[in-house]
């Protein structure tokens, strides 16, 4: 059904052609079903999603009681998504909880995550205000699904009570976990070349102020089971790696586990400069990185290698080690 696309393996002594299935734009796409296998009965059931032609079923997650599952359906134009709940025993649609559209595209990247202390509430991630943020859904409180205009130029309809937990000109990149005692969500966020770990309270919406004192850096985190401490692994432009144990109550360093030395210490290294230029819309900042040779002379002309990757989901210029240069 899906057209084969040839890939040449140049690592073999004699080049070999390996065909893969790739749904090229405008050509036939595969028809996918979502099935559930029960090991105790050795039987399969399939969700009654209707005709699967030109429909994608993504970001599947189980309900805490395992009696239903959730998925985010995307049309092939990828400009309309629906968050749906299906019965895991019958495969029937139970309810639609949310819809979102955009003239260009809508891009759900993460399955919903239920609160560990309340199986009627879950976190949904959306870019409907222009940045990826966290939204708290309360499935107990049903509302009439009116259509609203999004800040990013699209529309949305919600069928239950929804509260936006994070907001600002920055984006949530990863949910690390929860602190059930404090009712906090611990997450990683990015603003330009800055990144860091933060917490937002699901009860009152309060959070430690993002990026108020952050430096340009690139952070990765590993949270403990109770959500009280995390291992913060990060780098800056000039520092290859720092690993700290961090208390998530105030996000203060508790113990420094590692401060690595530069592997290039004593070597002459090219200079690295960063900055921004405006995109075609005249508003959006596009970050760039310039690397100059050690003996750079501004009065001379040099050949230039220009590398651009338009994405998505690949931040080439970062606040981390050597600003992301390799």
Label each region the model flagged.
Residues 45-48, 93-99, 145-167, 208-212, ...:
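Beta-propeller fold detector
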Residues 19-33, 50-74, 80-88, 93-125, ...:
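Conserved beta-propeller blade repeats
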Residues 2-7, 31-33, 78-84, 130-136, ...:
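Structural motif
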Residues 43, 93, 118, 130, ...:
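Cysteine-rich, disulfide-stabilized extracellular repeat modules
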Residues 33-41, 128, 282, 307-311:
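Glycine-rich, acidic and aromatic/proline-enriched surface loops and short helix-turn segments
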Residues 2-6, 66, 72, 212, ...:
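Serine-hydrolase catalytic core recognition
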Residues 38-42, 88-90, 139-142, 201-205, ...:
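Short loop/turn segments that connect beta-strands within beta-propeller blades
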Residues 1-46, 150, 241, 249-262, ...:
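Predominantly five- to eight-bladed beta-propeller fold
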């Amino acid at each position: 059904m899906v057209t084969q696309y040839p890939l040449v393996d140049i690592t073999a002594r004699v080049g070999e052609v390996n065909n893969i299935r790739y749904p090229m734009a405008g050509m036939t796409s595969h028809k996918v079903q979502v099935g559930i296998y029960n090991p105790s009965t050795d039987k399969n059931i399939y969700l009654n999603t209707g005709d699967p032609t030109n429909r994608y079923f993504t970001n599947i997650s189980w309900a805490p009681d395992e009696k239903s599952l959730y998925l985010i359906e995307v049309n092939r134009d990828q400009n309309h998504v629906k968050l749906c709940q299906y019965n895991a025993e019958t495969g029937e649609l139970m309810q639609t909880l949310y819809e979102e559209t955009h003239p260009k595209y809508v891009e759900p990247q993460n399955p919903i995550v239920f609160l560990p202390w309340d199986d009627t509430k879950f976190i949904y991630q959306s870019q409907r205000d222009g940045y990826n943020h966290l939204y708290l859904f309360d499935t107990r409180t049903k509302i009439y699904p009116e259509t609203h205009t999004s800040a990013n130029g699209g529309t949305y309809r919600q069928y239950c009570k929804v509260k936006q937990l994070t907001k600002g000109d920055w984006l949530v990149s990863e949910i690390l976990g929860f602190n059930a005692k404090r009712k906090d969500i611990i997450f990683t966020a990015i603003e330009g070349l800055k990144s860091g770990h933060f917490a937002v309270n699901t009860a009152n919406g309060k959070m430690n102020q993002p990026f108020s004192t952050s430096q340009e850096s690139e952070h990765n985190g590993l949270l403990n089971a109770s959500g009280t401490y995390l291992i913060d692994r990060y780098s800056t432009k000039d520092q290859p790696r720092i690993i700290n144990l961090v208390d998530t109550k105030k996000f203060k360093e508790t113990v420094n586990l590692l401060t690595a030395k530069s592997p290039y210490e004593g070597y002459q290294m090219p200079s690295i400069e960063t900055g921004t230029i405006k995109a075609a819309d005249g508003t959006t900042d596009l970050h760039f990185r310039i690397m100059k040779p050690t003996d750079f002379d501004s009065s001379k002309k040099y050949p230039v290698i220009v590398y651009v990757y338009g994405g998505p989901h690949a931040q080439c210029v970062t606040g981390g080690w050597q600003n992301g240069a390799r």
